[in-house]
Structures are given as C-alpha cells and as structure tokens.
C-alpha cells in the first residue's frame, strides 16, 4: 500500500496534463491515526502546501485545499482529510521544485506514506458554482453532500440544481455553492454520481441550519418532493478548512 501511495505522490508532481474548458477536480481522502494528526497537518502546511503553491504560480494547477472532516463516528481512532486538487485539465502538469531538493521531497513523501491508514479518491467535473470561483480561496467551512441520481435523469437534475438551488445559495447562511459530477466511477457498485457543496462562514451557521425545523407550505412541500424524485442524499460531510493555496 505504501508503494502505491508513493507512486501516486510521484505522479502527482510529475504527470503531464492537457487543457480543458471546465476545471477538473480531484478529491483525495486520506485517513491517519488521531495520534498523527498534528504532525500530518504540520507537514502539509510546511512542505506540501508550498509545493502546490509553487505549481500554481507556474500555471500548472488552479488550486489546492486541505479539509478536515469533522463528523467522524464517535470514538473513531482515525481522522480523515480531504485534499482538493483543482486542475485546468485531466491530469497533473508539474515542473521540478525549486524550493525543495529531490532528496527532501522523497523523504517527506516517505514520512507521509508512513502516516497513512487508508486512502480513496474521486474525479469530478465542476458543473457550476455561485458565490465562489475555482480560482478563489474557499470559505472556512464546507458541507459536501453525496447524491445518487438516476443516469436517465441526470440532465433534469443538473438543471434543477443550477437553476433553482444554486441561485438561492444565500439561504440558510450559505456563502457559496457548487455542483460537480463524478466522472471516475460508474456502475451499480458506485451509486454516488453527484456532489453539491455548501460553504459557510462558521460551524455555528452549519449547526443552526441543521437544527432549524421548517414548516413547509403545500406548494413548498410539493416543490421539494419534486426535487427528491431526482436525487437521493446518501451522505454528508462537515469539513473545516486547514490550508488552501491559489
């Protein structure tokens, strides 16, 4: 597994990419032991974030974020981080680092791999956003919603989100909103095929939005039920921003 992680890290900083109109977003989920969280964050801020910033300044990528998932199960011995790589195309185009030697990079990558318990990934195509752009640093708190959509209703679902949910993003204290389609997984074993993103200023605003009980009118209830016929919410992650580079 560690060899796989090291191989991925090498690809991350050496693979060529081609340009594309819409940015591609790579999600990497990385789980570490709770006892390693502090040193993991320190390494990301002091080493890897600088490497990503260097590539951004060279024009090889649009952005990089590190998020910590806050709603892990009670008593979990691990913590999961989400890394967001925003690319102009379908891969990673990187030039050799001028701030770290090859030896330093290899040592940091080895230490990184030694901390990892498990990993996962998604490749996404950004469909649209309101209140925030890919080239802007994100707000400090994020709720990511994992949606299951009937493939035959994908267009109808996208239009509903982009024309109804997106323009009304400011409701419930949201500062920004986005929609992305999963393009790396297909088939019945991978139900989730869309993600929505709700950005907030504080954790209190997220909790307030979730604790508020709304009394729907008949028309509102009918509208929301029509939305639910297009999508099914499978999971939701509350995340705190740890680091970001643009």
Which stretches of residues belong to each language-model region?
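Short S/T/G/P-rich N-terminal loop/turn motif that feeds into the first structured element of a domain
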Residues: 19-246
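Bacterial Sec-dependent N-terminal signal peptides
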Residues: 1-22
């Amino acid at each position: 597994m560690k060899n796989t992680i090291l191989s991925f890290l090498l690809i991350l900083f050496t693979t060529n990419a081609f340009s594309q109109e819409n940015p591609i977003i790579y999600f990497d989920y990385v789980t570490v032991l709770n006892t390693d969280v502090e040193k993991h964050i320190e390494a990301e801020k002091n080493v890897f974030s600088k490497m990503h910033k260097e590539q951004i300044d060279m024009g090889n990528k649009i952005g990089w974020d590190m998020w910590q998932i806050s709603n892990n199960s009670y008593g979990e011995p691990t913590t999961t981080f989400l890394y967001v790589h925003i690319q102009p195309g379908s891969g990673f185009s990187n030039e050799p680092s001028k701030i770290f030697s090859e030896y330093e990079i290899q040592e940091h990558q080895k230490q990184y791999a030694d901390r990892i318990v498990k990993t996962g990934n998604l490749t996404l195509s950004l469909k649209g956003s309101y209140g925030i752009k890919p080239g802007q640093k994100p707000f400090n708190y994020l709720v990511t919603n994992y949606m299951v959509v009937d493939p035959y209703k994908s267009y109808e679902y996208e239009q509903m989100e982009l024309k109804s949910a997106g323009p009304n993003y400011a409701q419930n204290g949201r500062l920004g909103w986005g929609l992305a389609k999963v393009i790396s997984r297909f088939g019945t074993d991978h139900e989730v095929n869309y993600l929505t993103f709700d950005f907030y200023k504080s954790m209190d605003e997220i909790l307030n939005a979730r604790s508020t009980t709304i009394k729907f009118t008949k028309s509102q209830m009918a509208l929301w039920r029509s939305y639910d016929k297009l999508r099914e919410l499978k999971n939701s992650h509350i995340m705190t921003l740890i680091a970001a580079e643009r």
